[in-house]
Amino acid sequence: MLSTLYQNDLKKKRNRRRNRSAALVCCPQKEGSVLKPRIVTPKKPNSARRPVAKAKLTNKKFVVAHIPGTGHNLRKHSTILVRGGGCRDLPGVRHTCIRGVSDFLGVRDKTKRRSIYGIKRPPEMAKRVRRKFRAIFGQ
């Protein structure tokens, strides 16, 4: 049987996938400025005080972004870089701030998982230079 035009239109709409971080508009990250850093509580089975920041992105959209790690230095008008992917138990939080970029400092005294928390390699963890290259690199 032939389908009507309305039925064809329904089939097209059904296949579309919802974009979870629509505010980024096909970009991996966007820069923005903090409007209000605050603390929110998670959904029912969990109990905590999670820091989030309401931010205005460079494309004039407003998002609520999760602040990862312990402690932060964000104030009003701080510049942050935001990526997709929020906190599962915080409703309405669909983005995450990236640490160690622009005004947002990395977590202090962190040695493991440094790339997540924006920390450079400390000098005591420097790579060992192979013997045949020591003359070149001066070690």
From Swiss-Prot:
PANTHER family: 30S RIBOSOMAL PROTEIN S12 FAMILY MEMBER. The keyword Protease does not apply. GO terms for biological process: translation. Pfam families: Ribosom_S12_S23. Keywords: Mitochondrion, Ribonucleoprotein, Ribosomal protein. This is Small ribosomal subunit protein uS12m. InterPro entries: NA-bd_OB-fold, Ribosomal_uS12, Ribosomal_uS12_bac. Protein S12 is involved in the translation initiation step. GO terms for cellular component: mitochondrion; small ribosomal subunit. Belongs to the universal ribosomal protein uS12 family. The keyword Protein biosynthesis does not apply. Residues 11-20 have a biased composition (Basic residues). It comes from Paramecium tetraurelia. It is found in: Mitochondrion.
